[in-house]
Swiss-Prot record:
Name under which the protein is recorded: UDP-N-acetylglucosamine--N-acetylmuramyl-(pentapeptide) pyrophosphoryl-undecaprenol N-acetylglucosamine transferase
Family of this protein: Belongs to the glycosyltransferase 28 family. MurG subfamily.
Membrane topology: Peripheral membrane protein
Enzyme's top EC category: transferase
Main location: membrane
Purpose of the protein: Cell wall formation. Catalyzes the transfer of a GlcNAc subunit on undecaprenyl-pyrophosphoryl-MurNAc-pentapeptide (lipid intermediate I) to form undecaprenyl-pyrophosphoryl-MurNAc-(pentapeptide)GlcNAc (lipid intermediate II).
Listed Pfam families: Glyco_tran_28_C, Glyco_transf_28
Domain of life, per lineage: Bacteria
Membrane-spanning parts: none
Catalytic activity: di-trans,octa-cis-undecaprenyl diphospho-N-acetyl-alpha-D-muramoyl-L-alanyl-D-glutamyl-meso-2,6-diaminopimeloyl-D-alanyl-D-alanine + UDP-N-acetyl-alpha-D-glucosamine = di-trans,octa-cis-undecaprenyl diphospho-[N-acetyl-alpha-D-glucosaminyl-(1->4)]-N-acetyl-alpha-D-muramoyl-L-alanyl-D-glutamyl-meso-2,6-diaminopimeloyl-D-alanyl-D-alanine + UDP + H(+)
Organism: Desulforamulus reducens (strain ATCC BAA-1160 / DSM 100696 / MI-1) (Desulfotomaculum reducens)
UniProt binding sites for UDP-N-acetyl-alpha-D-glucosamine: T10, G11, G12, N124, R166, S196, I256, Q301
Entry keywords, A to Z: Cell cycle, Cell division, Cell membrane, Cell shape, Cell wall biogenesis/degradation, Glycosyltransferase, Membrane, Peptidoglycan synthesis, Transferase
């Protein structure tokens, strides 16, 4: 079996694509995979390091405002389409799978026009424009959030699968994780992070939160500031007269490399609302306070957060409205109402899809030529 996988620009498109690629390798003993991306996206660096063959095409995204640059983009789209046709002719795939990002457009379209089975996966509650267009041509559309289905015209080819999570998320053990971070068994653990680079607004709100909950008998806090914000955050604590030596329940790190262990140790989470993060929170049944990144394309993080908040799995605080006082109140509401915390955890777990990868692979099998 031969498969082309395409998706790029950001890690949110690339890592699900790589998860699907590995899922195909597990399911089909003789699968050959080619990853098609652009040289400008993160995939040009990430994919070869993941040991998958990589080919690039020329394509870039349209500007949202009227711009002469869009004439160049349209020319590149045509050129990228011709390059995609050439790659497809040479590689001769049995299936083409797209996970979003503008690079998907030419590749999935070229495959669909040649009658090659195609599948796309949408990570967010509000689908990206590329996937909204491609859904009209793809044989299968797999989605992470039920909320996203309304934005697609053809509902007959849509399957709610969820988003594949890292295998280590499901394999990690809580007691081992607690010991690793020197956390106590008899306290609730609040995990706070703002993505790999951190989030300045969350860090600012956490200064007051640490002041409030330092030495609290019910709660311990594990907070990742992000590498870029660590020094500034530690200085903020100092300027506010906060000395961590006096608190036995606060752990501050610039970055958490073994995030799967941190998540397993947590009882509640404060974070941004990227699709991959929410997939991991729900598969573990974690209640959360979500502060969506306000500059995400098409505001998709707010849509993601709302999908959880409306089902009782999370509290949504907009970035523009976040203050230390608001965060403290949200944490207080969860701490003081154990029944609410328990119900949020149940609601979160209901949304979790630990079989997401397996379900996506089944959708791939459904559209493969019979001889496969």
């Amino acid at each position: 079996m031969r498969a082309i996988i395409t998706g790029g620009g950001t890690g949110g498109h690339i890592y699900p694509a790589l998860a699907i690629a590995r899922g195909l390798q597990s399911r089909f003993s003789k699968v050959q995979i080619l990853y098609v991306g652009t040289n400008r996206g993160l995939e040009a660096d990430i994919v070869p390091k993941a040991n998958f063959p990589f080919q690039a095409i020329t394509v870039s995204g349209l500007q949202r405002k009227i711009s002469l640059e869009n004439f160049k983009v349209l020319w590149q789209a045509y050129r990228g389409y011709r390059e995609a046709v050439g790659i497809i002719k040479t590689f001769n795939p049995d299936v083409v799978i797209g996970t979003g990002g503008y690079v998907c457009g030419p590749v999935v379209m070229a495959a669909a026009r040649r009658g090659i089975p195609t599948l796309i996966h949408e990570q967010n509650a509000f689908p990206g424009i590329t996937n909204r267009i491609l859904s009209k041509f793809a044989d299968q559309v797999t989605v992470t959030f039920e909320d996203s289905i309304r934005y697609f015209g053809n509902k007959d080819n849509i399957t709610l699968t969820g988003l594949p999570v890292r295998p280590e998320i499901l394999q990690a053990e809580r007691q081992t994780a607690l010991e690793m971070f020197k956390l106590k068994n008899d306290k609730l653990t609040l995990l706070v992070f703002g993505g790999s680079r951190g989030a300045r607004k969350i860090n600012q709100a956490m200064v007051e939160t640490i002041k409030k909950y330092g030495n609290d008998e019910r709660l311990q806090i594990l907070h990742a500031t992000g590498q870029a914000g660590y020094e500034e955050f530690m200085q903020e604590l100092k300027d506010n007269g906060i000395s961590l030596e006096h608190y036995g329940n606060i752990i501050i790190k610039p970055y958490i490399y073994n995030m799967h262990e941190a998540l397993v140790a947590a009882d509640m989470v404060v974070s941004r609302a990227g699709a991959a993060t929410l997939a991991e929170l729900t598969v573990l049944g974690l209640p959360s306070i979500l502060i969506p990144y306000p500059y995400a394309s098409e505001n998709h993080q707010e849509h993601n957060a709302r999908a959880l908040a409306e089902r009782g799995a999370a509290v949504l605080i907009k970035d523009s409205q976040l203050t230390g006082e608001k965060l403290i109140q949200a944490i207080k509401d969860m701490l003081q109402n154990k029944e609410k915390l328990k119900n949020m955890a149940k609601s979160s777990q209901k949304l979790g899809r630990p079989e997401a990868l397996s379900d996506i692979i089944k959708c791939v099998e459904k559209i493969l030529p019979r001889q496969q």
